[in-house]
Amino acid sequence: MLMFKFFFLLFSFLFSFNSYSYWQQRVEYKISIDFDHKNHQFLGEQNLKYFNNSKDTINKVYFHLYFNAFQPGSMMDVRSRSLPDPDRRVMDRISKLSKNEIGFHQIKKIEQDGKSLIHHTQGTVLEVELAYPLMPNQSTDFYLEYLSQVPVQIRRSGRNSKEGIDYSMAQWFPKIAEYDENGWHANPYIAREFYAPWGDFDVSISINKDYIVAATGILESKKKVNNKNIWNFKAKDVHDFVWAADPDYVHDILKVDSENLELHFYYQKTNDEMVSNWKRLQDDTADAFRYINKKFGKYPYTKYSVIQGGDGGMEYPMATLITGERSYPSLLSVTVHEVLHSWYQMLLGTNESYLAWMDEGFTSFAQNITFNNEFNDIYKLDSKNPLEGSYNRYYNFIKTGLEEPLSTHSDHFSTNQAYGVGSYTKGAIFLMQLGYIIGEEKLYSGLRRYYNEWKFKHPDEYDFLRIMEKETDIELDWYMDYWVKTTHQIDYSLEVFEKDKSTVSININRIGK
């Protein structure tokens, strides 16, 4: 009887441990597109092997069709026109797009292991009913054919940017949604955040021979076929793929041997000042990588590309798209910010729809620390408090009464300002104040431990918190509960009363919640 109880308890423990063990889905993409630059359209063939590493049986899957957001009446369009403080890059521009300016994905065929599938498209989401269930620890193969049109560049992706870049190709293919312990995350696209499974990409782009192509991954081959070149890129262990193309790109390469890294820079020769800035940027980017590798953890890939394109600055695996016609401090600032996103979101793949503060906030914190230590001759931050500007922005925003909890879904903030100040500014202060609580040395050792234990995974806020608690042996749930889940502030006043010449009475009053 005693032996039976022992084995029963052992089995119960193992079952319980297995029930809560970490898992994540995985994908393998093989995409080939034939690009028609005259009509801004491309035909795509996409093979996708999908690995179900969950304990669940899957009967349907979802894909994101991001280009469909750039159509009059889309959710992105309506939301932009409804916000009290719309993004100036978007405003009502989508509502004014003509038929040949909109974006779209038209799914021509989708199969599962050779069997045609029933599918439905609603806005930016494609719902696909499987021919047969996908069981736990099994994989299946999808095949898609589609026609896509590249929209006029409004937000992140598109053609003919304001700086004259022909194609900024972000969120350009039907991308399978993430499935995790909370189920599917097939959120409609309204220009905010992304979340996708880890995997490998093999992408072939057939485009007019005059174009220079920059992309995620390593260029495996470039073959001329008739009047086109076929560019083949491969990337391992990433959760997205970006590319850009322009006939006038200058392509510079800087080898950083100490970091086992090649830095690639793609930009236009718009004017002498711009060329000078982009040349200067190259050594500074190398210095940034050297510092960040030591401070926050080693970058694991052998390539990173800084690409002129898009509408501001946006991070992708092994690359960023940035606008390039900037003053040098602005150019370096946006580059360092996007480089740091390689740590916070590209390698620590949080669900930024729910945890934008762990993406933008952690990046903004690390950006200021990097500036203070490497580039303070340019930015002149307060060395004792490199985030002084963040504290001032947050304090001024609190007074507006518009603050919302950081735990708000990024698509559901009532204003763009609440999202921006919360995610970027309050998120950065989260780490600064955490350092005050646990000590600066423990903060940075904890950040490196967090990176080393959770890179190539999908951590959440509690995974981060547990790392910091292990590193410090301090309970920190209270800090998360108040700083992230509420808008309570630390606010005290002092009242000083002189009772007589030798006695002073001081009252400390708590004003904040």
Feature names for model-found ranges:
Residues 354, 360-429, 433, 437:
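Acidic/His/Gly-enriched intrinsically disordered linker/tail segments
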Residues 85-112, 119-120, 141-248:
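Extended, low-hydrophobicity, Ser/Thr/Pro/Gly-biased non-transmembrane segments
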Residues 321-387, 447:
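Zinc-dependent metallopeptidase catalytic helix centered on the HExxH motif
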Residues 43-69, 74, 85-89:
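Ligand-binding face of N-terminal immunoglobulin V-set domains in extracellular IgSF glycoproteins
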Residues 176-183, 191-336, 365:
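Hydrophobic helix-coil surface modules that form long, contiguous segments used
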Residues 15-43, 163, 476-478, 490:
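N-terminal, polar/Ser/Thr-rich
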Residues 378, 420-506:
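Amphipathic alpha-helical substructures
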Residues 50-54, 508-513:
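Asparagine-centered strand-capping/turn motif at beta-strand->loop junctions
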